[in-house]
Amino acid sequence: MIHSILLIGQSNMSGRGFPAEVEPIHNEKLFVLRNGRWQPMFVPVNPDRATAGTNLSESFADLYAKEHNVDVGIIPCADGGTCLDQWQVGSLLFDHACYMAELASRTSTIAAVLWHQGESDCEAYRYPLYQEKLTIILEAFRKKLNLQDVPFLLGGLGDYLPNYRKPNEFKNYVHINQALQNIAQTMPMTGYVPANGLLPNHDNLHFSAGALREFGVRYYQEFQKLEDKNKVFAEKSTPDNAIRTELEIL
């Protein structure tokens, strides 16, 4: 039985933390989807760019696996630098995430969806429509993937963004965070995860590795508030070749 986690959003969901700054997570129950099969989790979990690194899903998955005593598979579909319009229903990113989730669902059951995005929508002409657009996208994911009873977790933008080298670039981040909170308050099975106090890399744009470890814990704490403790996951057959062998990993 594999419980899986879908990652969607932009670079802070992809993860830009420097792996050398944190202790690696060693847990044989953690896997990542590659080419339709599961292999032991490695870093970077979401290699969308050469700069990909530590990911918040690592600590989230570690806590989930330990509490539920199950294998946990991560479905990495985040893409750095993307604005909300690039995630609209029918877009390449939306369809890719749905395809990967459906593929993963053949050998696992999706237990949570983690979203972090919004830096690219801080511009004055974008943020006023953020809540409306994201609501449509999230509802479409739920319908397409039949995830009505699955927690969706929306992470807030870092409060360090005003320190970015272009001070006005992200001045509207508070409006994005408010939109995320509004959605969490009105959409069933949806939670908001605050990023208050989390530290950035030197670029003042991406969360540091240590911050991502903590952020993953916060995501999991919010997940615990939403999950149905009595939910029974349907048994999914895992073909012999669905999980890569040690030899195949070499």
Indicate where each model-derived feature is located.
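Cell-envelope and extracellular/periplasmic
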Residues: 1-250
